[in-house]
Design a protein with these regions (language model features):
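Cysteine-centered motifs
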Residues: 7-9, 44, 74
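Short basic-hydrophobic amphipathic alpha-helical segments used for membrane targeting/insertion
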Residues: 22-29, 33
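Positively charged N-terminal leader segments that act as targeting/secretion signals
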Residues: 29-31, 59-60, 65
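Long, contiguous internal "core" modules enriched in hydrophobic/ aromatic residues
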Residues: 62-412
Length: 412
């Protein structure tokens, strides 16, 4: 271990001193085998003793076992029925809506929306308007536009949420690269220095991933790579690095950090030594455990938005930690999402994520109009109940949001 800490920054995981690397890998493998066996035993016992409906609540991605999203529901008994529902075209689906009591003024228009959006995607939007969930009959007076309005609201909520996620993600990338490049060992190539990580396993996984990303760019000869760039002759940064430099074999961190996906960025932050995680969090006026939790939530919400999933009236499965420190901007009443508070709001829906995004925007974009746009969106759709997002009716009166509105009114 002392030899490992004293060795110079390796260019590859294979450049580590051989006996030391083997010892570390053997120990890591042994730990992994013990953990895998233990989780396998626990998973088998869980499957044998727990009704399938409860597995979604008892298994988590971190456990290494089965994971089902909170939207998943399953019968306690093993399924025995054969699925025999026929596929219907949009005109038949319009007739089904009419049979269930939905008012449709223009059938051709409704059929067009079903053709280009899909009956299945619209189905969750019909649930609040159903008087009977068994036969899916609608509350008298419900129109097709009522359902479409929910879908449009959710789509606009996607766009607004994605806007804030983009700003926060870019800020985290910049903070990680800046802090690690100037305050840690290794300079621009800090990610190759084992001492910057919690352990060898985290270090090894990160370096291997970056080497893999770089190797993808080396698959083409330099002349071929140049042909792959756009016609304006602005080659991407990785292509430029590979065509210009022979060493180090991987590019500097400010380039590498842009190659990572949001999920890889979140894992990289979690793998860093704690003192660096704290420094990066301070850059955003957050605490280390709060930022680590929020990043996990952002990856989940980002993936939902990227795949056009539903944000409205949905349990996310992963939710952000509620900050306890007074240094982190949050709602005036910090017990709003406290599970010990009988009047607390649901933590597993979108609202805590929205609050966390605005909390970070106070630092990275102090005069952003994002909060005002959120308020305008909800006012634009008054028939959308705020509790579907886990929001109270008077949510905008909180001093937290009032400060955001005031800052936005000054200038962007």
């Amino acid at each position: 271990r002392l030899q490992q800490r004293e060795c110079s920054c390796p260019q590859s995981t294979h450049d580590l001193p051989e006996p030391n690397r083997n010892e570390l890998e053997i120990r890591a493998s042994a730990r992994s085998s013990r953990v895998t066996a233990r989780h396998l035993t626990q998973s088998c016992r869980l499957l044998l003793t727990t009704p399938p409906r409860l597995l979604a609540h008892q298994s988590t991605p971190k456990s290494g076992g089965f994971y089902l999203s909170t939207d998943y529901t399953c019968r306690a008994n093993s399924p025995t029925r054969h699925y025999s529902k026929p596929a219907l075209n949009e005109n038949d689906l319009v007739k089904r809506y009419l049979e269930r009591g939905l008012t449709i003024a223009d059938r051709d228009r409704a059929a067009r929306y079903l053709r280009h959006i899909g009956y299945y995607r619209l189905s969750p939007c019909t649930i609040p308007f159903q008087v009977d969930r068994t036969n899916h009959s609608f509350t008298p007076g419900t129109t097709f536009d009522d359902i479409l309005n929910v879908y449009v609201f959710d789509r606009e909520l996607h766009l607004l949420t994605t806007d804030a996620l983009e700003r926060v993600e870019v800020a985290v990338r910049a903070a990680t690269s800046n802090i690690m490049s100037t305050h840690s060992g290794g300079g621009a190539f800090w990610y190759r220095d084992y001492s910057n990580y919690q352990n060898y396993k985290d270090y090894s996984a990160t370096v291997k991933r970056i080497e893999h990303l770089t190797s993808l760019g080396r698959q083409y000869a330099p002349s071929t790579r140049r042909e792959q760039t756009d016609r304006l002759h602005y080659p991407d940064a990785l292509t430029h690095y590979l065509d210009t430099y022979t060493s180090p074999t991987t590019p500097p961190s400010w380039l590498v950090i842009e190659l990572l996906t949001a999920g890889e960025l979140q894992r990289l932050y979690a793998d860093l030594a704690r003192k660096y995680r704290k420094a990066i969090a301070r850059e955003l006026h957050l605490t280390e455990p709060v930022l680590q939790s929020w990043l996990k939530s952002y990856v989940r919400v980002r993936n939902i938005c990227a795949h056009h999933g539903r944000l409205w009236n949905r349990f996310l499965g992963v939710y952000p930690a509620i900050p306890k420190s007074g240094t982190v901007r949050w709602l005036s009443d910090r017990s709003t999402f406290d599970t010990s508070n009988p009047e607390a709001l649901e933590r597993k829906r979108l609202y805590p994520v929205l609050v966390s995004l605005q909390s970070t925007l106070f630092t990275i974009s102090p005069h952003s109009s994002w909060a005002l746009r959120l308020q305008n969106l909800l006012e634009k759709h008054p028939r959308i109940p705020p509790n579907a997002l886990s929001m109270r009716k008077g949510w905008a009166a909180d001093r937290f949001w009032q400060d955001a509105f005031k800052a936005a009114s000054q200038h962007e």
